[in-house]
Amino acid sequence: MGVCGAARAQTTIAISMTAPPAAPRLQGPFTFGARPSTPLLFAIPATGQSALSFTATGLPTGVTIAASTGIISGTTPAAGSYPIAVTAMNGAGSATATYTLVAGNTLALTPPMGWNSYDSFGASVTEQEMIDEGTAVRQSLQPFGWNTVVIDYRWYEPGLPIDSNGRYLPATSKYPSATGSNGFKPLADKIHAMGLSFGIHIMRGIPRKSYDANSPIANSTYTAKDAGNNADPCPWDDHMWGVRGDTAAGQAWYDSLFAQYASWGVDFIKIDDMLNNSTKVYHQAEVDAIRKAIDKSGRAIVLSLSPGPDDPSWLPNSASNLNTNANQWRIVNDFWDTGDGPLCDLNCAFTAIRTWAGVGGLTPGHWPDADMLPLGYLGPRKEWSGGNHQTNFTKNEQVTVMTLWTMLPSPLIFGGNPMRLSNDAWTLALLTNEEVLAVSQDGLGARGKRTASGSNEIWSRDLSGGRKAVAFINRGTSDATMSATFSSLGVTGTPAVRDLWHRADVTGMTTSLSVSVPGSAALIYTLTPPGTGGAGGAGGSTGAGGASGSAGRGGGGGSTGGTAAGGTSGRGGAGGTTGAAGRGGTGGAGGGAGAGAGGAAGATGGAAGATSGASGAAGATAGTTGSAGSSAGTGAGTGGVVGTGGTGPTSGTAGSSAAGGGGTAAGGTTAGGGGSSTEGGGCSCDVTAARPTRLSMIVIALAFAACVLRRGRRRC
């Protein structure tokens, strides 16, 4: 595998800009974790025209879903796995998919996705701005799985107010609802009502102000001076001392702190200054104490660790401790769209991500964090690197950033201004490509690995259902053709290939994948081997009169049976027991003929999934009629390639490619995802087969040697 063919001048990548269809489509993550007996909040990510309504079956006792918002809430049940079948409906159709609640020590089972205020507001974001930006996140990003908003540092400035137990309080000049003992609870309640999790940034240690006052530590006999360590300052924030995390007093301090945050309704905490350059590890005793304090707090809180402006390149030394205690941890200094001063640029990020891709022993729920995404508009009060501006990354570099973060995978924390997305179609399309996000949020939680290096890189990542993601990253400035054999990627046979940034199926590749990658850009594909199932991804839609039985986009796609008019749909009517035929895979039965319950049901029109190749609609119509039914539906697919997975999952959970065309039922027309189309348009990928000539290989070798002489091997 590697680069073949001569380099060309750089072109600007064109990604699919197609908006989601009017009919509902359920998005990931499809697995979410929570701690037993703690408050539960999860808003179903769903796209489609307003107004959506939601129903669910399989909800544990004490857990409900709000019909108008899709917010699942209540008290997390006992440890276990709870599949919940969710249906979203609107005037254009309906969609059904299964979400799995995993109760246990199981937060952040897929990389967290959200927005942090720092890149756009520095230390100055206000309560009203958090509400406004949270509203924008809810409208533009949450339907695709972005579900957290975080206030970054120094929310206690000006004034550094503390309570009687030495704990910082929000500055009421910025957060007027935090008067008295309210803290952040009124703001957290408003964020939760949007279906979003609420997070804050804090500094490691204890306020010097509290130490000087020797404040009593709540619910203990200790004081601030018992816990604090004035020989362990933060090197860049003169408000804090360290804490003796391995002492009873230090543990009491952190217990008190996190009990306060839990009472405020905080769901996500980013702790800064966690790196200790002298010991070459995170401040491990404090990390241990923080973990214990969170577990005692009675609330499920995602723990994010940030190093501060130190060199985290040796952090794999701490990997075991981090995997035990943290949900995510930074692996770079602050990542920006420039390399000014101590900041981390794209080359720096590549180096760190390569390092962590090779670290073993990491498990789902514990993620190396390549930092926030400085994309879109960075302002209105950006503090670092050039003031307010649209990101300095080129469009090609922006696609590379999103691809690389997806392949590691890293948490996806947007740093740009969400309110600007309504007038920034490019950035919105970049952040909401559901096929790329499905790789990021894949339930297998596998880590990516670099399989080819040099001036161009190839990365692969195992996905659920036996599939693979492969990314071709062009580190050069000129366009280049890159290729990899399927066997070198661990794929047997000829897989179905899906180009995710262009939302297009790729045909004609039998033993290898050869693609043209614009300079400084990246392309990402999914490979679905013959006979494998599709992913559990986005639930597709059935038409206004049909049951929620459409297979989702991707390997779950195929012709679907709609519910016939005249009665309750039969058991097979809601999408059939298998998905659809995958190209090269098993020809799938579509909706299936579902007899009505008790003889009173109407017929379901199932599609006999006769096609297993790359063309054609689904097969003949089928359907039985219950005693009270009025007619059988028709299940012929409307055209296009039928899915890309093999045997798809049940109830219309998604696969890796576009959904197959829908069938028509007596009660309405089902809406599939459009077969092999690019979901109503989008861009086609420049995919060409190429064979290297001896001359071209000599040219590439000479160019690489010249680059090494000029810039060093790591930058070539």
In which residue ranges do the predicted regions lie?
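C-terminal membrane-anchoring or membrane-association module
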Residues: 704-716
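Carbohydrate-binding surface patches
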Residues: 399, 405-408, 413-415, 452-491
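Extracellular interdomain linkers/hinges and stalk-like, low-complexity segments
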Residues: 10-48, 93-111
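Glycan-recognition surfaces
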Residues: 227-232, 244-246, 252, 256, ...
